[in-house]
Amino acid sequence: MPVFDANGIPLYYEEAGSGEPVVLVHGALCDHTVWKPQVDVLSAKYRTIAYSRRYAHPNNREGDLMDSTVQNNAEDLAALIDGLGLEKVHLVGHSYGGFIAAFFALKHPDKARSLTLANAAVVTMLVARPGATASISLLFRSPSVALSARNLINATNDTVKAVDGGDATAAFRIFVPALSNHRTDLPQKPPSFEAMVTRNARTLRETTAPFPPVTKSEVRGIKAPTLVLWGALSAPWDYKVSQLLAQVIPGARAVVVPGTGHFFFLENVVMANEKMLEFLEALDHN
């Protein structure tokens, strides 16, 4: 079992294929297995590396999730890239992993060949300075975004409380539906999805750790060629964050995947993989 020691933090990883390296960064409640549909396709042309972030299955899960911050995960990623002898990598990040990938690209621009942000949860872009005043301002500017963000916060708190009480299934029952405002018309995810979310339920607590104050002005500093993808049926806060990323990052390409939500890359695998490959192959020809 390949495990890399990132400054004392064990990170399990799997790789397939050869060529330019592509590193896949998963979100909360997930692990490296969430990327299997992408690894199967990308590895035909690229050295594709999917790893489990700190405390995600099958890593040691007994640590303090409050130290699984965006900043610490970005440094774990830097250590993994260096440890595998890589120089520049194509980064693909989803949700909390998308925030990590974007933050990494800002802090380690020399290591980011490109950036693919999949429903990246860079929520700090919604308000310049988090707090009551900013929340009220957001409510007046965009009520649906503010209310959906509040729904997500409530779902997060309810889920963390339930998981702490021993109910790991709460992550799938309470939190996942809240990502798309409890929509019931989304395509089915793989049968393995519920099991993955349940075994990683405890990791949701990492999203309650303080976020780095990454604003729109800072995001403009991303230099790597960037593809921003998101599901058309994502919750309003989620949709808005991806829109902002696509608008603010210089030269970013934007793709909205119809009929899908927060996990669009599992709900429409064919289109998601097609758009990722198109983006990467275009860079190969530049």
What is the predicted function of each stretch?
Residues G251-N286:
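Catalytic active-site module of serine/aspartate enzymes centered on a nucleophile-bearing elbow/loop
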Residues L24-G27, R53, S95, A120, ...:
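Glycine-rich His-Gly loop
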Residues L106, R113-T159:
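Flexible "cap/lid" loop of the alpha/beta hydrolase fold
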Residues R150-R205:
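Conserved alpha/beta-hydrolase catalytic His-Asp/Glu region
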Residues D5, I9-M66, L80:
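Conserved HGGG/HGGXW glycine-rich cap/lid loop of the alpha/beta-hydrolase fold
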Residues L186-Q247:
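Conserved serine/cysteine hydrolase catalytic core
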Residues I100-F104:
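Hydrolases whose catalytic domains are alpha/beta-hydrolase-1, hotdog thioesterase
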Residues D40, I49-Y96, K107, E274:
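Active-site loop/oxyanion-hole signature of alpha/beta-hydrolase fold enzymes
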